[in-house]
């Protein structure tokens, strides 16, 4: 909420627009960055939405396009689950896996799942454009 209230959203939106990244990729990258740094998928989703909304609101996307962008954000929010994520520890403890094994299995599975979901969202967004 601090990031949203501080007005960093519009500034970040302008900076990302200046890079020329498509909005679907921007949504994925923002959510993934927050997820990797902070660990929570929920926080990653909400933060990414708060940061990209100023840009998205100006572009008049349809409901279907917004849904596709939501899929991109959701995908980014679950990639690279590691030691700062509660799910990482739950999986490891319930399965009896070591930290190294959990990184090889859980982290890889989450990354593949999130990336695949985001790619589907990006394709859907392009088809709806």
Where in this protein do the model-derived segments appear?
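Core transmembrane alpha-helical segments of multi-pass membrane transporters/permeases
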Residues: 1-8, 24
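Helix-loop-helix hairpins and the membrane-proximal interhelical loops
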Residues: 6-14, 126
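Structural signature of hydrophobic alpha-helical transmembrane segments
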Residues: 11-23, 67, 71-81
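Short amphipathic alpha-helical coupling elements at transmembrane boundaries
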Residues: 13-18, 54-58, 93-96, 100, ...
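Hydrophobic alpha-helical transmembrane segments of multi-pass integral membrane proteins
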Residues: 19-59, 73-74
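Hydrophobic alpha-helical transmembrane segments
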Residues: 24-29, 70, 103, 107, ...
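Helix-coil boundary and interhelical linker segments in multi-pass alpha-helical membrane proteins
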Residues: 57-67, 123-129
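Juxtamembrane and boundary regions of transmembrane helices in multi-pass small-molecule transporters
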Residues: 75-129
């Amino acid at each position: 909420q601090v990031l949203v209230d501080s007005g960093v959203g519009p500034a970040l939106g302008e900076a990302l627009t200046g890079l020329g990244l498509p909005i679907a990729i921007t949504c994925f990258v923002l959510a993934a960055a927050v997820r990797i740094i902070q660990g929570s998928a929920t926080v990653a989703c909400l933060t990414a939405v708060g940061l990209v909304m100023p840009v998205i609101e100006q572009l008049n996307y349809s409901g279907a396009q917004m849904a596709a962008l939501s899929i991109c954000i959701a995908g980014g929010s679950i990639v690279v689950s590691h030691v700062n994520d509660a799910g990482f520890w739950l999986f490891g403890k319930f399965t009896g896996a070591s930290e190294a094994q959990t990184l090889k299995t859980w982290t890889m599975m989450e990354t593949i799942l999130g990336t695949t979901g985001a790619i589907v969202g990006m394709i859907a967004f392009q088809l709806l454009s």
